[in-house]
Amino acid sequence: MSSHFPLTFRISPLIRITLISLYFSLTLPLPFLADITSASVPPLMLWTGIVMGFIVLVGALSERVIVDEDTIKVTYPSWIPSFFRKGWSLPWSKIKDLKSRTTGQGGLVYYFVSLDAQTAFLLPMRIAGFSRLVNIVTEKTGIDTTDIRPLSQPWMYLVLLVLTSFLMIVDGWTIATAIGMGR
């Protein structure tokens, strides 16, 4: 397999679009409803929270996996504080194994285990080009990755995106009704 390094893998666009759409469909009606119900939380505070939450969500979805001849690393843009999301870097030569762990929902995630066995690093599984990344892991480490599959399949996010679209239709009706009642 011929690769031109460094390579950068980002979170899948389908996942980003779905999660951002879900966020807005769940939050946008709130300031309008707060206004017409005279809620104790003012609409301006809700708008501020929505914008701040959006910034946090975009930050979390801006993860990048960068691979080169010597290293795999997970990074985030410099505007994301390191206490919020910390990246990591691991030389290929220091990777001993990939260990699977069952999630609370019954899925499998994989961790790179370093040679010192003191640290483990989560294999990013929601990136576009996941199979290419897994092939590079095999090429660089010699670890058998034939059984490794993405944590969630694209159809799951497509279903969530379709359901979110229906929710947005209801949101539109809710917002229009709230604006109409406010007049």
Language-model segments: residues:
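Hydrophobic membrane-targeting signal helices
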Residues: 28-32, 57, 171-175
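Canonical phosphoinositide-binding patch of PH/PH-like domains
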Residues: 102, 106-136
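Structured surface patches comprising rigid loops and adjacent beta-strands/short helices at the edges
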Residues: 93-98
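Conserved beta-hairpin
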Residues: 50-91
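Juxtamembrane boundary at the C-terminal end of a transmembrane helix
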Residues: 168-183
